[in-house]
């Protein structure tokens, strides 16, 4: 059952970003990003990463919501363009949706998913030990992995957010 929930959330996640990439109007783009961010947090929490899901929810949906609100206020239109009002926008959305359906069918047919990263040793990561049980805590392991092996991810993410805010401010500033 958990596999189907993650699969459905993943499809909603990708369809949301396909809807964002066809970008009919900034108002709908911000809404789709917020919904996709919430679905992404649900996927993370479904895999047991409640700490990481909470952090993504607080940082992404809390911090970037201010930017989305600001850009929506600066770029409001009296008659915003929707997905079905332009044949090109609708075609891009349907093409992305078709590609997603083809990918889903391919994954369901092959029934194998490979691991992207493999670590040679996890023995020196933090171990949460209660009474010599030898159990790894997912939360402590995730935080340790994020700040030790994934330090470059934190730096790239911070830099990407900074560049994103600067680009948004430049676009909304106008002439």
UniProtKB/Swiss-Prot annotation:
Location, primary (coarse class): mitochondrion
Alphabetical list of InterPro entries matching this protein: ComplexI_Subunit6 (IPR050269), NADH_UbQ/plastoQ_OxRdtase_su6 (IPR001457), Nuo/plastoQ_OxRdtase_6_NuoJ (IPR042106)
Residues that span the membrane, as ranges: 1-21, 25-45, 47-67, 88-108, 149-169
Membrane topology (UniProt): Multi-pass membrane protein
Source taxonomy: Eukaryota, Metazoa, Chordata, Craniata, Vertebrata
Highest taxon of source: Eukaryota
EC annotation from Swiss-Prot or TrEMBL: 7.1.1.2
GO terms of biological process kind: mitochondrial electron transport, NADH to ubiquinone; mitochondrial respiratory chain complex I assembly
Catalyzed reaction equations: a ubiquinone + NADH + 5 H(+)(in) = a ubiquinol + NAD(+) + 4 H(+)(out)
Annotated GO CC locations: mitochondrial inner membrane
Described function: Core subunit of the mitochondrial membrane respiratory chain NADH dehydrogenase (Complex I) which catalyzes electron transfer from NADH through the respiratory chain, using ubiquinone as an electron acceptor. Essential for the catalytic activity and assembly of complex I.
Compartments in which it is found: Mitochondrion inner membrane
Entry GO MF terms: NADH dehydrogenase (ubiquinone) activity
Record's subunit section: Core subunit of respiratory chain NADH dehydrogenase (Complex I) which is composed of 45 different subunits.
Stored Pfam families: Oxidored_q3
Family in the record: Belongs to the complex I subunit 6 family.
Keywords: Electron transport, Membrane, Mitochondrion, Mitochondrion inner membrane, NAD, Respiratory chain, Translocase, Transmembrane, Transmembrane helix, Transport, Ubiquinone
Cross-referenced PANTHER family: NADH UBIQUINONE OXIDOREDUCTASE SUBUNIT ND6, NADH-UBIQUINONE OXIDOREDUCTASE CHAIN 6
Official protein name in the record: NADH-ubiquinone oxidoreductase chain 6
């Amino acid at each position: 059952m958990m596999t189907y929930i993650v699969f459905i959330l993943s499809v909603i996640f990708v369809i949301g970003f396909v809807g964002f990439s066809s970008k009919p109007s900034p108002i709908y783009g911000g809404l789709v990003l917020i919904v996709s961010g919430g679905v992404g947090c649900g996927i993370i929490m479904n895999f047991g990463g409640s700490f990481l899901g909470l952090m993504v929810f607080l940082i992404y949906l809390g911090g970037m919501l201010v930017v989305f609100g600001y850009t929506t206020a600066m770029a409001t239109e009296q008659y915003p363009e929707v997905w079905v009002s332009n044949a090109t926008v609708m075609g891009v959305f349907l093409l992305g949706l078709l590609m997603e359906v083809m990918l889903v069918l391919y994954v369901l047919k092959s029934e194998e998913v490979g691991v992207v990263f493999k670590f040679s040793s996890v023995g020196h990561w933090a171990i949460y030990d209660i009474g010599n049980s030898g159990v790894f805590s997912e939360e402590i392991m995730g935080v340790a992995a994020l700040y030790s092996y994934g330090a470059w991810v934190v730096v790239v993410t911070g830099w990407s957010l900074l560049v994103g805010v600067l680009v948004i401010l430049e676009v909304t500033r106008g002439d």
